[in-house]
Design a protein with these regions (language model features):
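N-terminal pre-domain/capping segments
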Residues: 1-108, 144, 174, 178, ...
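Active-site groove signature of glycoside hydrolases
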Residues: 107-127, 146, 151-156
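Active-site beta-loop-alpha junctions enriched in small/polar residues
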Residues: 13-15, 50-54, 82-85, 120-122, ...
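Acidic/histidine-rich catalytic cores of soluble enzymes
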Residues: 7, 46-47, 78, 138-234, ...
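Surface-exposed, active-site-proximal loop segments in enzymatic domains
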Residues: 20, 55-62, 83-99, 119-131, ...
Length: 291
């Protein structure tokens, strides 16, 4: 059979406009309809939507209209982002559980592919792995009836910051649990050699972007303001893509460009340029035939 087509998902911050993670608001200044139309026109096959924008879009459109907007623009690989503090207790857990339920309800309504989650964001020291594993299993169990995958992102500013730790967290979970592997996080923790060790059953999603070899300020500052369009930085994008394909991955590819330069671009220009520069990275990639 022919190789699987390359289909791209615009992770939320890529087309959100002039907002940023942890800002005063995370809801996009661009209405969801505008983002969806710009994405569809450029060739994207899915969007990510964060919790704050989920709530704002529901208030503005209602869920039936949101579903129709996504369908009309051929956006089929959609994601809900990003759940934090699900391993905590008390008031923090209660807040996380409310967000979880709202993201899963919305994700079910739009047939979302993934619920993205962090693991120990901004926490230092070794993670309480038994607790993480138990809570993750519960997340997967709650998401499974909706057909939603729960995907963990290891990050260099989280307690779960490597491929090995992330695999330890998810490896005994349900079938809908696994990893979202972002090349920026891979690079900043020098995890390139670990990518091929990820079992295909646990490789649920991949995100592409680029960056300079040198970190600008702190890791968090660099991640939030200085990611680059694919091919305009120093990350090992093509070899990373090849390693992911060699594992056997055939799913859609997320693109997460969190960048001052991109967030201040006109929406249609951002949709087009990010799409084109990302697709250009696949030009000389060797793909196995789809099973």
């Amino acid at each position: 059979m022919a190789a699987a087509p390359i289909e791209l998902v615009a992770s939320y911050w890529t087309l959100a406009g002039n907002v940023m993670p942890g800002g005063p608001t995370e809801a996009s200044p661009h209405p969801l309809r505008d983002r969806a139309e710009a994405a569809g026109k450029a060739g994207w096959k899915g969007l990510g939507i964060v919790h704050g924008d989920v709530l704002a879009s529901i208030r503005h459109y209602g869920i039936p209209t949101i579903r129709r907007i996504l369908e009309d623009n051929a956006l089929v690989h959609n994601e809900v982002e990003v759940l934090t503090k699900w391993h905590r207790d008390g008031a923090k857990l209660a807040t996380s559980n409310q967000m979880r339920d709202e993201l899963l309800d919305f994700g079910a309504a739009i047939c979302a592919r993934n619920l993205k989650v962090t693991a120990g964001l901004f926490e230092e020291g070794p993670p309480d792995m038994p607790k993480f594993r138990d809570r993750f299993a519960d997340l997967c169990e709650r998401a499974a009836p909706y057909g939603i995958q729960v995907v963990v992102e290891f990050m260099p500013f989280s307690s779960v910051d490597t491929v090995d730790l992330a695999l330890e967290l998810v490896e005994n979970g349900l079938a809908n649990g696994g990893l979202m592997v972002d090349i920026w996080h891979v690079d900043r923790r020098d995890q390139y050699d670990k990518v091929k060790t990820i079992p295909l059953s646990l490789l649920k999603g991949v995100e592409l972007n680029d960056a300079s070899a040198n970190v600008a300020g702190t890791l968090l500052h660099d991640s939030t303001h200085h990611r680059k369009l694919c091919g305009e930085g120093d990350l090992k994008i093509r070899s990373f893509i090849q390693d992911v394909l060699d594992v056997g991955y055939t799913g859609p590819w997320g693109v997460e460009i969190i960048s001052h330069a991109v967030r201040t671009m006109p929406l249609e220009e951002a949709a087009r340029r990010v799409y084109e520069t990302t697709m250009s990275q696949f030009g000389e990639i060797r793909q196995a035939d789809a099973a």
